[in-house]
Amino acid sequence: MLVVSYDIKYDKLRTKFSKMLTKNGAVRLQYSVYEINNTERVMNNLMVIIENEYVPKFDGGDSVIIFDVSAVKLKKYGNAIHRDKDIVYF
C-alpha cells in the first residue's frame, strides 16, 4: 500500500494530479493525502507517471511524498476507521 501526500501550488496542475491518482485507484484520506492499495505493477506505473509527467512541471515549492506502508502496521483513528468496512445495502 502507498500513501501519497502532495503540495502543489498551481490549481490546474494540482487538480490534474488529484484526478490522476483517483483514476489509478487512489482513495482520498485528507485534502492532499491519498491511499493506494493496488497491485505492485499499478503502483510502479503510478510512480513512473509522476516522475515523467508531473515532476518536470513542478515549481520550486511543489512536492510529492510517497510512503510505502504495510497495511498490517497501519493504525487508523476517527473517520478513517470506517473507510475499510464493507457497506451492506438491502
Task: Name each model-derived stretch.
Residues 16, 44, 76:
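Short acidic, gly/pro-rich beta-turn/loop elements at beta-sheet edges
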Residues 22, 46-48, 84:
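Short, charged/polar low-complexity linear motifs in solvent-exposed/disordered segments
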Residues 29, 36-60, 73:
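Short, intrinsically disordered low-complexity segments
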Residues 8-12, 39-45, 63-65, 85-86:
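Short linear motifs at secondary-structure transitions and domain/linker junctions
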